[in-house]
Design a protein with these regions (language model features):
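Extended interfacial segments that mediate partner engagement and assembly in macromolecular machines
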Residues: 66-78, 84-197
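Internal alpha/beta scaffold segment
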Residues: 166-208, 229-264
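Short beta-strand elements
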Residues: 21, 137-149, 153-160, 212-216, ...
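Short, acidic/hydrophobic/Gly-rich beta-strand patch recurrent on exposed beta strands
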Residues: 29-34, 157-160, 224-226, 366
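Terminal RNA-binding accessory module
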Residues: 1-78, 82, 379, 387
Length: 502
């Protein structure tokens, strides 16, 4: 420690040189100068960097990376030229191997620190994170905001971190390669036909967002333009409703792109940050595209809930099904089931499966997916898990051999956890998108009589800080016991020898 810096007060715009010794939960580099902590976006553990303080507090500060003086062995050149400005990827400067280690450590440390579990116990049951062979071009869905730059030029791209400022870009490296051609086609059409971009501040302008989806197994592509449309549509000569000026030109250009299967319009006139409205009109070919996940075929509409990384989702769900240990006779409850992907996948190995989801559209999709795949042993309920589960258990006496839960980031509701403990399933499979709330819920379940058996992270979103985790818990029966063989002769001899020596 440098005595000359003892008691120094750090302030905004100070330039400092620091070694990065840790990684924060949001992927930021962490360094310390005389006990004063600096959080630096885009810095990598092992870097020596020059930074400028942007926001100073008493014991810590947020700083901007000015220069990498000595790069870490884990630092790489990002594929994306706007990686620093864009808010989508936080870890592109870090090697993929180090990203996986960061996520493994993040899950482990949260369970130990926030859940109060013994580190050695967690280390003994943690399995290696499930990574991707190729961590790019994995997203089958992307939503691109449309706006204008300071010169009035129409742009599309991605929001900068913690803002709604659009960073222009059409070639996202974690999205499908078709995104670029589709977006450039739409921008060119808008410029030629003087179609306005939406302005969030004024609420004026027509085109708000572009949604692009692709079925990885089918190769089918969907484009949906979200527009601020307040008038009445008119019919073209072909009978198609028109919502855009010279709409036929746009359809002609987009339909020429290989794989194009569905073009639609979504109406959203609300002054809101919510991207999609509820009114969707198909203007070319099909309303949906198809994809396959876990051996099941799904029809996907613009509003459908569907995993954005089907490659990793299959691995994650396969692990969850393996943990469930199904033999063909079990009754399974799947809470927060979405469109029923896990529910339907487990139905093939269970006696009866029940899915619960609060969003009606998702349950409609789940029921349709069950019919489409010829599944007859699955039932779905609309409602809050913490309300539906107690009702079915207390009023109808429905039980569970296995309960699978995949809650939102806030974790599982305490009422649902309490009912799960009362139902006392043999196994609980917990799929989590937030290891902090996972740790909290695991503590409740373990205090209620369950034991952690396995923990396995899964990298669903490479280049970002997000990590999924699947956990297996088993019921500890009151009569569980440990068999210990004791050699009484040996014990007696040891007691005698101890008494003689004294």
């Amino acid at each position: 420690m440098n005595d000359n810096n003892m008691g120094r007060i750090y302030k905004k715009d100070d330039l400092l040189t620091v070694e990065i010794t840790d990684i924060g939960n949001d992927g930021e580099g962490i360094g310390k100068i005389d006990g004063y902590t600096l959080f630096i976006k885009d810095a990598v553990i092992g870097d020596k960097v020059k930074v400028k303080i942007m926001k100073a507090k008493k014991n810590y500060a947020y700083a901007h990376l000015e220069e990498v003086i000595r790069p870490s062995d884990d630092r790489v050149i990002p594929k994306c030229p706007i990686a620093r400005q864009c808010g989508g990827c936080q870890l592109q400067f870090m090697s993929y191997e180090r990203q996986l280690q960061f996520k493994q450590d993040k899950v482990r440390n949260n369970i130990v620190r926030l859940g109060g579990f013994d580190p050695e116990e967690i280390d003994s049951i943690m399995e290696p994170i499930i990574g991707m062979d190729d961590p790019f071009e994995y997203r089958n869905k992307a939503q691109f905001p449309v706006g204008t730059d300071k010169n009035g030029k129409i742009i599309t791209g991605f929001y900068a971190g913690h803002s709604h400022n659009i960073i222009p870009g059409t070639d996202c490296k974690i999205g499908v390669k078709e995104n670029k051609e589709i977006l450039e086609t739409i921008i060119s059409y808008m410029e030629r036909n003087h179609v306005s971009a939406y302005d969030e501040e004024t609420g004026k302008g027509l085109v708000r967002h572009v949604l692009i989806r692709k079925g990885f197994t089918s190769g089918e592509i969907m484009v949906c333009l979200i527009i601020n449309y307040r008038g009445k549509s008119s019919s073209s000569k072909s009978g198609v409703q028109e919502y855009l000026p010279n709409q036929g030109e746009l359809i002609e250009k987009l339909s020429a792109i290989k794989g194009m299967t569905s073009i639609s319009i979504d109406i959203n006139t609300e002054k809101t940050n919510v991207i999609m409205g509820l009114e969707v009109h198909t203007i070319w070919r099909r309303e949906t595209i198809r994809d396959t996940l876990c051996g099941l075929e799904f029809n996907i509409s613009p509003l459908s809930f569907y995993q954005v990384n089907p490659v990793q989702a299959t691995k994650l769900y396969d692990q969850a099904i393996e943990y469930a240990g199904l033999t063909g006779n079990e009754t399974v409850w799947d809470l927060y089931c979405g469109i029923g992907t896990i529910t339907l996948a487990m139905s093939k190995k269970a006696g009866k499966v029940f899915g619960v989801e609060i969003i009606p559209q998702a349950i409609d999709d789940a029921k349709q997916n069950a019919v489409q795949n010829g599944i007859t042993n699955a039932e779905f309920y609309v409602g809050k898990a913490e309300e539906v589960l107690p009702q079915k258990y207390q009023e109808e006496g429905i039980y569970a051999d296995v309960i699978c839960i995949d809650p939102p980031r806030k974790g599982c509701d305490i009422a649902a956890l309490d009912t799960m403990l009362k139902m006392a399933p043999k196994r609980i499979v917990y799929v989590s998108c937030d290891s902090a709330t996972l740790a909290r819920d695991l503590r409740i379940l373990c205090d209620g009589g369950y034991k952690l058996e396995s923990v396995r992270p899964c990298d669903m979103f490479p280049m970002s800080v997000h990590v999924e985790t699947v956990v297996l818990l088993s019921q500890q029966k009151p009569d569980d016991y440990i068999e210990i063989e004791v050699n009484l002769d040996s014990v007696w001899e040891n007691l005698n020898s101890t008494s003689v020596s004294q």
